From Swiss-Prot:
Keyword Glycosyltransferase tagged: no
GO MF annotation: an example: proton-transporting ATPase activity, rotational mechanism
Protein name per its UniProtKB record: ATP synthase subunit b
Protein's job: F(1)F(0) ATP synthase produces ATP from ADP in the presence of a proton or sodium gradient. F-type ATPases consist of two structural domains, F(1) containing the extramembraneous catalytic core and F(0) containing the membrane proton channel, linked together by a central stalk and a peripheral stalk. During catalysis, ATP synthesis in the catalytic domain of F(1) is coupled via a rotary mechanism of the central stalk subunits to proton translocation. Component of the F(0) channel, it forms part of the peripheral stalk, linking F(1) to F(0).
A Pfam family per the record: ATP-synt_B
The family this protein is said to belong to: Belongs to the ATPase B chain family.
UniProt key word Cell membrane: yes
Transmembrane regions: 5-25
Location(s) in or outside the cell: Cell inner membrane
Subunit and partners: F-type ATPases have 2 components, F(1) - the catalytic core - and F(0) - the membrane proton channel. F(1) has five subunits: alpha(3), beta(3), gamma(1), delta(1), epsilon(1). F(0) has three main subunits: a(1), b(2) and c(10-14). The alpha and beta chains form an alternating ring which encloses part of the gamma chain. F(1) is attached to F(0) by a central stalk formed by the gamma and epsilon chains, while a peripheral stalk is formed by the delta and b chains.
Length: 156
């Protein structure tokens, strides 16, 4: 292989091409590669942030769900307690009403008994007066008076 002028010119052209490429072509390519690398890194970082935010959101949802369940259980317990209180109050009111009705019934019974006693007294007094009239109209006879009193006692 001979080293001649063509080989030297080709080396100079190649060196000029390398310089031209290093000065004008390589920096935009390197910049584009770096931008692409940054863009991919940003995308990966954003994906990681999104994954972490998703995990946090899932934890918050679980916590809020637990709180909602606890709150609903508390509301149900309060409602059951209130229902029990209402039932107890209704039972007490019914018991008081029953006592009042029983007392009124006893008072009515006592009034009816007193009325019956009064009527009985009136009838006894009437019978006594009638018996006394019969005794006075008849002759005074111990045996007859005794029989009249026995009859009077039987009527009473």
């Amino acid at each position: 292989m001979d080293i001649n002028l063509t080989l030297i010119v080709q080396m100079l052209v190649f060196a000029a091409f390398v310089l031209f490429t290093m000065k004008l072509v390589w920096p935009p390519l390197a910049k584009a590669l770096e931008e692409r690398q940054d863009k991919i890194a940003d995308g990966l970082a954003a994906a990681e942030r999104g994954r972490k935010e998703l995990e946090l959101a899932q934890h918050r949802v679980k916590d809020e769900l637990k709180q909602a369940k606890a709150h609903s259980a508390d509301i149900i317990d309060k409602a059951n307690k209130r229902a029990s209180e209402i039932i107890e109050a209704a039972k007490e009111a019914a018991k008081r009403e029953a006592q009042i009705q029983a007392k009124l019934a006893q008072e009515q019974i006592a009034q009816q008994v007193n009325h019956a006693k009064e009527e009985l007294r009136k009838q006894v007094a009437k019978l006594a007066i009638t018996g006394a009239e019969k005794i006075l109209m008849r002759e005074v006879d111990a045996k007859a008076n005794s029989e009249l009193l026995d009859n009077l006692i039987e009527e009473i």
